[in-house]
Amino acid sequence: MDYRLAPEFKFPTPLNDFFTAFRYIYENASRFGVDQNRVAVGGDSAGANIAAATCLMAKQLPEIKVSHQLLFYPALDATMSSKSHHQYAEGYGLDSSTMVYCWDQYVQDESEKHNGLVSPLLAQSLEGLPDATIFVCEYDPVREDGERYAQRLQEAGIHTKLHFLEGMIHGAIHMTAITSEATTIYSKIAL
């Protein structure tokens, strides 16, 4: 789904756009020939952030149930506190200065970086969220965002599958023309 993007539209506009579209599809699932019990969210990188935050928003509304979250190398912590943010800060495609710039463009001010809807990894509780499939790349600044989120989901009793993509960098699902390893990602999704 397209949603309005930062920097022109800062948080919460992109999230609200996505959630509004998700809710419309969910509430009108039969019109689209979709089983309402199987409406899932997913995304990669910033899109995975929006998908995870959508799950947090939906759990506040008993009439809406996200069936699954599919997250590819999710950026889930605007404070960039994970060790991988420093370990892979440069030389692996997505660098630390780009991450800082993107987060700064997304939020109105620094304090929002601690908001669970900006940084789902920092949300107070992950209980009641949908099952998750999370892909993380070995050489990626946000690798530990995905790993820590998966761990927190499991601790909250959420069925979670974590896939570690050895030798891959951020953006791996878009690299099928470059490496056959990227193609295996799609076969894992279908399982």
What are these regions (language model features)?
Residues 1-191:
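Alpha/beta-hydrolase superfamily serine-hydrolase fold, recognizing
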